[in-house]
């Protein structure tokens, strides 16, 4: 199997992911659907050879990490083709891999459906901005577009902490330091603590995985830095609850107060199928207001969704507002809108 040909085919077919798994032909995910190549099923020796070639393309990365731990994440670039993010793993004793295709050039935000209110958060000087949603919903791309906007318009020091690095940012008006976990630094929390001594203006934290990382991220936002990060939640209230619930019960009151002071926005996004067989992102945008700050501080978090739902303006709107607009524009069906809605009964009355 020629791994370069496999990667070229994925880029040519606008695939987002490539699956190399023993017992199946090579498979691609494009527009949310998985398509299998009409070839013979891959045997374990073939998947092993493919995974070994991926490690060679990643600059001779040590495959022993995968062999000893059973999984490994890394990224690499093929000049003139694209960047790729690999999650290699063992399944049924055979080496396998899922390869994410990452374009060299960032798409224009408006071309991929990122609304102006989301992009406006690049202009914040401090605080915490969270981009949330399920895996594969485009969170990394949204964050990369925000970093790119800052890089090309402001004189800042931007530090990104990623696992692994996806989009590469060239220095422009800003200085961009990109650090990869397990390559340039040991862990998110160590890198985050170190970044506070590196004169940052903006910190992009790839993922808030535990309470220790969340705690340091909020401290960074509290001390005058702009912090972007992600969570696998949908909806502003769910996101706030998730952050507070990560902490021990005796700290949750203090964390709620701290979060109410530093949180600037929660952007939730999903990819939904369109009538032409493609996908389009749909967003919920919550911008912080005095009323929402009070709700977070006073343990009235469930009421936040009501504020967002009733606002339904471009600068703050619910997921259902975005779905309704896509339906009115003829881009998605009513069934799709209802299946992705946060309040299907309410949305059904508006369709």
Predicted regions and their residues:
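Short, flexible helix-loop junctions that flank or precede catalytic/ligand sites
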Residues: 1-351
């Amino acid at each position: 199997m020629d791994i370069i040909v496999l990667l070229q085919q994925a880029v040519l077919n606008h695939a987002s992911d490539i699956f190399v798994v023993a017992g199946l032909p090579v498979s691609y995910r494009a527009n949310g659907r998985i398509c299998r190549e009409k070839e013979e099923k891959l045997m374990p020796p073939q998947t092993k050879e493919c995974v070994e070639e991926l490690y060679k393309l990643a600059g001779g990365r040590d495959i022993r990490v995968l062999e000893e731990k059973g999984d490994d994440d890394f990224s690499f670039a093929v000049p003139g083709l694209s960047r790729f993010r690999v999650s290699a793993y063992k399944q049924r004793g055979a080496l396998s891999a899922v390869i994410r295709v990452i374009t060299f050039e960032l798409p224009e935000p408006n071309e991929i459906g990122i609304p102006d209110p989301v992009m406006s958060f690049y202009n914040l000087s401090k605080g915490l901005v969270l981009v949330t949603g399920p895996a594969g919903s485009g969170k990394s791309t949204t964050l990369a577009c925000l970093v790119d906007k800052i890089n090309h318009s402001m004189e800042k020091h931007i530090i990104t902490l990623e696992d692994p690095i996806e989009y590469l940012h060239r220095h422009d008006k800003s200085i961009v330091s990109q650090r990869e976990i397990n390559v340039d630094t040991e862990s998110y929390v160590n890198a985050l603590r170190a970044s506070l001594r590196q004169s940052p203006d903006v910190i992009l934290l790839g993922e808030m995985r535990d309470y220790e990382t969340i705690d340091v991220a909020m401290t960074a936002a509290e001390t005058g830095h702009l912090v972007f990060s992600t969570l696998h939640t949908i909806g502003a209230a769910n996101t706030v609850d998730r952050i507070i619930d990560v902490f021990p019960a005796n700290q949750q009151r203090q964390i709620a107060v701290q979060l109410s002071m530093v949180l600037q926005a929660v952007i939730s996004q999903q990819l939904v199928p369109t009538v032409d067989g493609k996908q389009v992102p749909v967003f919920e945008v919550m911008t912080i207001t005095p009323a929402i700050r009070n709700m977070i501080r006073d343990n009235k978090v469930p009421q936040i969704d009501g504020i967002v739902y009733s606002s339904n303006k471009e600068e703050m709107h619910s997921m259902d507002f975005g779905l309704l607009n896509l339906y009115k524009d003829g881009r998605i069906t009513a069934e799709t809108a209802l299946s992705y809605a946060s309040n299907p009964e309410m949305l059904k009355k508006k369709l």
